[in-house]
Amino acid sequence: MSLSLWQQCLARLQDELPATEFSMWIRPLQAELSDNTLALYAPNRFVLDWVRDKYLNNINGLLTSFCGADAPQLRFEVGTKPVTQTPQAAVTSNVAAPAQVAQTQPQRAAPSMRSGWDNVPAPAEPTYRSNVNVKHTFDNFVEGKSNQLARAAARQVADNPGGAYNPLFLYGGTGLGKTHLLHAVGNGIMARKPNAKVVYMHSERFVQDMVKALQNNAIEEFKRYYRSVDALLIDDIQFFANKERSQEEFFHTFNALLEGNQQIILTSDRYPKEINGVEDRLKSRFGWGLTVAIEPPELETRVAILMKKADENDIRLPGEVAFFIAKRLRSNVRELEGALNRVIANANFTGRAITIDFVREALRDLLALQEKLVTIDNIQKTVAEYYKIKVADLLSKRRSRSVARPRQMAMALAKELTNHSLPEIGDAFGGRDHTTVLHACRKIEQLREESHDIKEDFSNLIRTLSS
């Protein structure tokens, strides 16, 4: 049996799976083929369980298609493949990294997937008091399709700091949970190693600290502080734009931390290469580990967020009320929680039960503003401008891809961002049938899974229309 078998499986999996999934779950696996058994080694238990649950059938199917009745048995283990005398005895993943997902510099070794920091006995009192918010944990982060990969990547980093995906770069619009995940990682790291030095900050704080250090002739102390951390969590890295001295200092800090296997996690409101005013060498390094998007939450996740938030406040929120709010407020988690806080406050002040009519009254101005901001006309104009076509093209019978794909995108956005029915949306797009709208919505949903570009387009348009 050829020892290139796992390489064949990798090539097929890379073709079949979304690039982010392949990079996150399949690439870290190491393989060893022996005695008709293919052993797959995962860097930690979390990865092992995920791969076995989600991809076991895919891998077994490929083995059978390549080998037929002689397909090897699969075995999963945590750790690294054993060192053998024969170089061919072990096969590791060397498939080229997918573009724009996990980029590595040619002169730098690929990110390691070691088992994490060595466990050390916890001192009676931690020697360093972190500024991580203990209220933000993985347990109270509501997971959905829109943030599943980001949460999974953050969970792995918390379990394997300095090894799994370093740096981790999370990007997405305001209020989608990036900051929550930063703090959750920090809490996860300190749960495993209570004396770890974990520093969370907004990027502007880094700039302010550097300016003070320069004014006080204390730049060496500044460098020592930031390069001594076990994990550096920086929010809104886009605020480094056009701050050349800050970028220069962060560049050297970044390199020093990675060389020391110290974890870096960054967030931004946009993909690294789209951050204007930041040096290319920094943007390149941002992609050395793993880059994951967080998208606006889908309806089911919005409902779950409202129900969990209400439960945390000991408030009974009827399901139909949560659905009513979630259907109308779509842009981000912060907006949802703010609306719910207003509903709860009004209920406490008035002593009234929380019903749909009560919510409609309590959120009257917010709901009116939302309906005014997002209309089908607005969506059509925004999409046409984004794709550099005319609104008339969206309404026409033209079927060329340059028009059909934007039209499908606009229909999907209309379904996502407005309360119009499918027939109403179809009417607004040149009198099309509701089945055409349904097909468009399903097509865009499929393409968001398969195409990084379509996923980016959808997120960018959602962000534009919701701002």
Swiss-Prot record:
Region (Domain I, interacts with DnaA modulators): 1-90
SUPFAM superfamilies xref list: P-loop containing nucleoside triphosphate hydrolases, TrpR-like
Pfam family, one: Bac_DnaA
Region (Domain II): 91-130
Keyword Nucleotide-binding: yes
Subcellular location as annotated: Cytoplasm
Residues covered by region (Domain III, AAA+ region): 131-347
One GO BP: DNA replication initiation
Alphabetic keyword roster: ATP-binding, Cytoplasm, DNA replication, DNA-binding, Lipid-binding, Nucleotide-binding
NCBIfam families in the cross-refs: DnaA
Quaternary structure and interacting proteins, as annotated: Oligomerizes as a right-handed, spiral filament on DNA at oriC.
PANTHER family hit by this protein: CHROMOSOMAL REPLICATION INITIATOR PROTEIN DNAA
Function: Plays an essential role in the initiation and regulation of chromosomal replication. ATP-DnaA binds to the origin of replication (oriC) to initiate formation of the DNA replication initiation complex once per cell cycle. Binds the DnaA box (a 9 base pair repeat at the origin) and separates the double-stranded (ds)DNA. Forms a right-handed helical filament on oriC DNA; dsDNA binds to the exterior of the filament while single-stranded (ss)DNA is stabiized in the filament's interior.
Protein name: Chromosomal replication initiator protein DnaA
Organism annotation: Escherichia coli (strain ATCC 8739 / DSM 1576 / NBRC 3972 / NCIMB 8545 / WDCM 00012 / Crooks)
Species classification: Bacteria, Pseudomonadati, Pseudomonadota, Gammaproteobacteria, Enterobacterales
Gene: dnaA
